[in-house]
Amino acid sequence: MKAVMLAAGVGRRLYGHQNDDLPKALLRFEGKTLLERHVGILKALGVDELVLIVGHRKEDLLAEAEKIAPRGSGGFIRSVFNPRFKEGPIVSLWTAGEELRSGDDVLFMDSDVLYPPEMMSRLIRSVHDNCFIIDRDFEPGEEPVKLCIRDG
């Protein structure tokens, strides 16, 4: 299984429209960047590769990726550049299209979500071919990601 992670965005909801701030994947929680945390969880759960879709400040993301999983030691992280990253996450999803159509099992995730390890484990070990993680207590707001559920 491989993971495809969107990390190309400029973080408008966090930083505003005109920014040059670090990518959200480089925010630190308990001394680790989100990216470092994600890589640790994915490796522990047996994921073979992380395909990181980069754009905004890609050099910073790639430097962190190299620090976490050096290419010379087997290269767990492979990057794909989205030159149109300012156009939103749907373009990054399109950039990852080849990875998603490869026929491999794919875990698709955002880099800016603090995923609990137990939640990731449950998702990866699911017997279903396609599944989503859903917070049923979530109050929808302006967040652009929504999921409609039939009969429930």
Language-model features and meaning:
Residues 7, 54, 110, 134-135:
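Short beta-strand/turn micro-motifs composed of small residues
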Residues 60-105:
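Short phosphate-binding loop-to-helix
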Residues 116-152:
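Conserved core of the sugar-phosphate nucleotidyltransferase
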